[in-house]
Structure formats: structure tokens, C-alpha cells
Amino acid sequence: MYHPNYNYPPPQPGWGGGYYPPPQQHQQQQQWSPPPPQPYYSNGYPPPSQSPHSYSPPQYPPHGQYEYGHHTPTPPPSSGSQYRSYHSHSPSWGQMPPRPPMEAQQFGKGAPSNYRFQYSACTGRRKALLIGINYAGQPNALRGCINDVTNMSTFLHERYGYRREDMVILTDDQQNPMSVPTKANILRAMQWLVKDAQRNDSLFIHFSGHGGRTPDLDGDEEDGYDDVIYPVDYRTAGHIVDDDMHAIMVRPLQPGVRLTAIFDSCHSGTALDLPYVYSTQGILKEPNLAKEAAQDLFSAITSYGQGDFASVAQTAIGFLKKAALGESARERTVKTKTSPADVVMFSGSKDTQTSADTFQDGQARGALSWAFIKTLQARPNQSYLQLLNSIRSELEGKYSQKPQLSCSHPLDTNLLFVM
């Protein structure tokens, strides 16, 4: 693992998240105010109010001191499967799913006219960014996030041929200030991840830590809220908004570049603002306001019975925003957030759900991170649909969260999952 010297300028203020000055009181009042945090990955609530005193702002080394190396691409694990038709049928468990087609694909209805995307063969260079934040020494600390990153690093190296030299690992137990997951370091590492990416390269980002929500300012969210993640220095630097992560890691990618994202945090359903979200039947999801109204009503009744009147009000406001913005927000997202690249994300929960900090295989783990690794170790050659259902099956009966599959383009969910 190389220590980073990113040498990239910070995002411009127009990105909406950028590098914030220390948050002022009036800024805090504008954010959604959820109920007190539970022992989960934030429950949509920022990490504890105590300042992360263990971490001072990083002092960046001189140019060249922590450079990344450049290495010959490592070929992917061999497979005897040949490419098949894009329009594939759902394979059985004993059948190898078809590999992705190499010709350009059309987006179809709802996307810009004459817009095409390209699947990645994942035969080029591999790079990975792994971020795990336990928020050590803070009242709302987590236990499993650093373990998640350690396990994911080993899994990527042993199963998918990612070189240790091409991984950047940011965790809050490291002494090197460039390896601490501050907002500045995370944003620079995201820029490093996608820099100079070429067709058939395979990029990977894994975030395990606190997540939450903040009011949507650009009208691209069906529920009126943006998803956010919390760096270790969120108290002084602010959170990182999904719009910014999309602008940094999705928008610059060329056709045929693969970015696989695993977000094991609360309210992470659309953490990269990918417009195509799929059900466990492989069907593209559309806003269903009638169903969501029933779910929100049940949530409100439950909160009322528990005396949580703040949640009742938030639920009501949230549904009213969905009703007013849902269809137009989706249309805006499809028009502005599609990509010719091959970006796929598995998230720990829906936008409205929390994600569990759990104990599995003798150590604290994030539920999604654990299930993702376990199911691919047991059955490496799964389709996207099989993988989504396998992950959900691992969590079903243990946790209430429902992991999500989303993509930057229309996805044939019966194709072989590759990365």
C-alpha cells in the first residue's frame, strides 16, 4: 500500500459540498434533525458532538514524498466463459452467467438521445480506495469499520488480483496524517482513484462508517434529501454529499471504465446518485408513492407509539416532499446523472434505512461488507441479480436493512458480476 500524495486541487465551491469552512450555527439548523443516535452506522444522525480530539489537521508532505507507484495491470482471474448476448435469460445456480458484451449499448427511454454506454471487461489496471472510520474515542464510535477495510483489502487481493501497491487505505487508527480519513484526504483519494482511468480498467471504492442525510438543494432526489458520508473531521470540515461524490468519481469516467462501489453506511441507497436502481427481481424500480405512503404511515404510527414525535413530523414532511418531487426528481436524475462508464454500487440500505454494526466470524463487522465478501467467496460466479439476492439472504432474519443495487446505466442484471 502506497501512502498518498494526491496533488489535486480541492473541489470548486459550485459542487455543493466542496471544502466547507467550520460549520456555523445557522448551517446546522438547516439540516434534517433526526432522533438520537442508536448503535448503528449513524441512523442518519451525525457522529457524536464531541470533537475528534485524537486527530489534528493533516500536514501534507512535500511533493514526491508519498507518491503512488505505477504498475503493470494485473490480469483478472481466468474464466472459460465466452461473451454472450446482452439480452440474457436468468441463469440457474449451476449455470455460468453470460459475461458482459463489448459493443456499445443504448440507454433507451428517459436518457439523452443517441446516448450510449459501455460495459467493462475489467481486464485493465485495478485500483482500490478503502475507507474505514471507527470514530475512535467518540461516544458514537463504531467497532467494525476498520475490520471491514482490512478484510476487503485481503479479499480484493486474493480473489480479484488487486495489487497492494494499487490500494489506498484510509482508516482512523493510522499515524501517517495522509492516511487518516479526513474530508480533504477522502476527496483527494477519490480523485486519485479515477485519474487516468482507461477502458476496461476496474476501480473499486469501499466506505464503511457513518452516513446520513441533508436537504437536497438541486432537486435530483425523490425524497428531498441528499445522502452524505461523515469523515473523521466532519465537525470542522463538514460532511461529503452524494452530488460531490458523483461529480468526482462518476462524471469524469470514460466509456468502458468500471467503478464498483460498496457503501456500508446508513441512508446509502443512492450515495453515488446512480439513477438506475434494481429490485430483487432484476426490475428497474420506479417511484411508488402509494406504497411509500403506506410504509411512511406505518413508520409514523410506530414513532408515535414510542413517543418519538420528531420522527412523526420528519416522516410526514419526507412523504410530502416525495409526492411533490418524486417523478420530476427521477427525470432530472436520469437526464443528468447517467454515465457512459460502467458504474455499479451495492449499498448497505435504502435511502431511508440504517445499516447495522454487527459481530460476525469472531469480529466486529459491517453487515453489508461481511455479506458481500462471504457470498462471493462461497459462489464466485454469480450474476448481479444472484449476488444482490445472496447478500439479502445473508442478512435476512438478522437485520432489517435491505441492500440496494444501483447503476449508472440500464443494467442487464443476469450478466456475470465482474470487477
Curated annotation (Swiss-Prot):
Keywords: Apoptosis, Hydrolase, Protease, Thiol protease, Zymogen
GO cellular component, as recorded: cytoplasm
EC number(s) given by UniProt: 3.4.22.-
Compositional bias annotation for Pro residues: 33-50
Biological processes per GO annotation: apoptotic process; proteolysis
InterPro entries named in the record: Caspase-like_dom_sf, Metacaspase, Pept_C14_caspase
Keyword Repeat applies: no
Biased composition (Polar residues): 82-93
SUPFAM superfamilies to which the protein is assigned, alphabetical: Caspase-like
Enzyme class: hydrolase
Active site: H210, C266
Annotated GO MF terms: cysteine-type endopeptidase activity
Segments of this protein annotated with the region Disordered: 1-109
Ranges of compositional bias, category Low complexity: 51-66
Function: Involved in cell death (apoptosis).
The family this protein is said to belong to: Belongs to the peptidase C14B family.
Name this polypeptide is given: Metacaspase-1B
